């Protein structure tokens, strides 16, 4: 019994301890657990509600997406139809463009082919014509006939021009009026002075005048001073200077001409040198005429001119003003080799010494034309495919004389490339009646 009571008391103590210390925490824990369960249930309900809402939103989004997809598909179909239409239109336009371009290309190629065929046919025709002409003019009589036909045409030209005197360019026509008047005055002074001189004195005069011109070429300040226009009262100073410089170095005839030249009015200082050079040439030509050698001198001068034209290297060496004049004159003398007479040699040496603004071949041609012009003649430089007869030369000179109103001296060069006819040059004018030029003109006027 006591055991039972003891056990009961122990049980009661245990119950008390459990109720006192175990039950409150358990209750608290259970309350918390219940709150947690309730919260979870609430959250679960909220989640379920959100799930329902999400499912509804998803379904709505699917419906909207289907509607948008249907609209996009309709728009895409419409765009596809429009694009297909545009592509068809573009393709049709491109086909039409290619078709038109192809037709244009066909037309252009046809025209080009026609032009090429015309050009080839024309060129072949000209070539064949050239062959026929060359074959024809191989006969000397036919060659001569081409010259006669040219002379006939030239005669018709002479009839249409009339007898009015035409100006022929000269080597000194580039001077201004004042210089031309002064040069004419110096020529008059020379003629008065030369009237009393013999051949040797004329040569001495030419040498003295050329020496003065050579001095003025090298002494620019002196040339400028002597050629400057001054009042009549100041001319005495020029004359005094000339006397002091040249009085004991040149002869009295040359000194008189130089004194006259420095008191004249010149448009440019170079014109003073040109006038002295002109007088020096006239002195030698006057000697040649008095000695009966003028025609030989003319012929030799023209021959040398043609040699210089044919030998540009020789002309360049003679024209090199930086080389000593003595060396250039020696070169000229070696080239002449004694084949020119004394006057021609002196004229050529003088010309080479005084070169300073023109080439040798031009200066020599000027001297040759001056020799002819002294007799109121002009020179016609004529080219022919073959030598012409004396009768043709005479007729040519007569016809040209009718055209230019003055005597014409004919200088002939042979150039087989002309084929036939003649080419006439007088001064700056050219009359081209050669067959080669006519063939070239025919080739230029071929249809395109």
From Swiss-Prot:
The keyword Lyase does not apply. The keyword rRNA processing does not apply. PROSITE patterns: ATPASE_DELTA. One of its GO terms (cellular component) is plasma membrane. The chain crosses the membrane at residues 4-24. Residues 1-168 are annotated as: ATP synthase subunit b. Gene3D superfamilies: F1F0 ATP synthase subunit B, membrane domain, N-terminal domain of the delta subunit of the F1F0-ATP synthase. Residues 169-448 are annotated as: ATP synthase subunit delta. It is found in: Cell membrane. Keywords: ATP synthesis, Cell membrane, CF(0), CF(1), Hydrogen ion transport, Ion transport, Membrane, Multifunctional enzyme, Transmembrane, Transmembrane helix, Transport. It is a single-pass membrane protein. GO terms for molecular function: proton-transporting ATP synthase activity, rotational mechanism. In the N-terminal section; belongs to the ATPase B chain family. F-type ATPases have 2 components, F(1) - the catalytic core - and F(0) - the membrane proton channel. F(1) has five subunits: alpha(3), beta(3), gamma(1), delta(1), epsilon(1). F(0) has three main subunits: a(1), b(2) and c(10-14). The alpha and beta chains form an alternating ring which encloses part of the gamma chain. F(1) is attached to F(0) by a central stalk formed by the gamma and epsilon chains, while a peripheral stalk is formed by the delta and b chains. F(1)F(0) ATP synthase produces ATP from ADP in the presence of a proton or sodium gradient. F-type ATPases consist of two structural domains, F(1) containing the extramembraneous catalytic core and F(0) containing the membrane proton channel, linked together by a central stalk and a peripheral stalk. During catalysis, ATP synthesis in the catalytic domain of F(1) is coupled via a rotary mechanism of the central stalk subunits to proton translocation. This is ATP synthase subunit b-delta. It comes from Mycobacteroides abscessus (strain ATCC 19977 / DSM 44196 / CCUG 20993 / CIP 104536 / JCM 13569 / NCTC 13031 / TMC 1543 / L948).
